């Protein structure tokens, strides 16, 4: 049976939200999810940003290199330092949330700033699905990434912009997309496809990433000219 991935909107609910230290969310959907989160775990320096906006997270997790001594003293009850350097702060925060029993996790602020951090954060989604068996979504100001494997169905809408990033598939076929897909050798080859209707079906034999936009291409162009 194929796994189903729903659309993400401002009413989507998650067990926990992990706020990373990239560009702070500014679009309506990620901000609404952040404001209404059941549990907020900030990655290291993201705790500073969140608190400066008048909020207190449930936890701040990381190696502590972005926090001052005064900050650490003031918020010692919610700060959890992990000094090992084999993983990044996003992964440390993920492990923390999993240990709390959370399995459905949204990542915000994971993109922007340094591009190597952005690629690393996105790439970790595949590891989290395989190693931790969690359901995760990474939201940006424009859309959202999910990691998937095998045969899957993705909720969509006509004109939604969709990009596919092959990880290890030798077979990758789609139904409901404007352009035919295959097991892409390079990441750029699967970008900028488009949904024809309310569902995209993927038949594959491996892992891949999917990015779906909040708006259709036409809506995006209209919003740009407002």
Regions found by a protein language model. Give the residues of each.
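N-terminal beta-strand-loop-alpha-helix module at the start
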Residues: 1-71
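Solvent-exposed alpha-helices and their adjacent loops that cap or buttress functional pockets
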Residues: 7-12, 32-35, 53, 99, ...
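Long, charged alpha-helical interface segments
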Residues: 141, 148-226
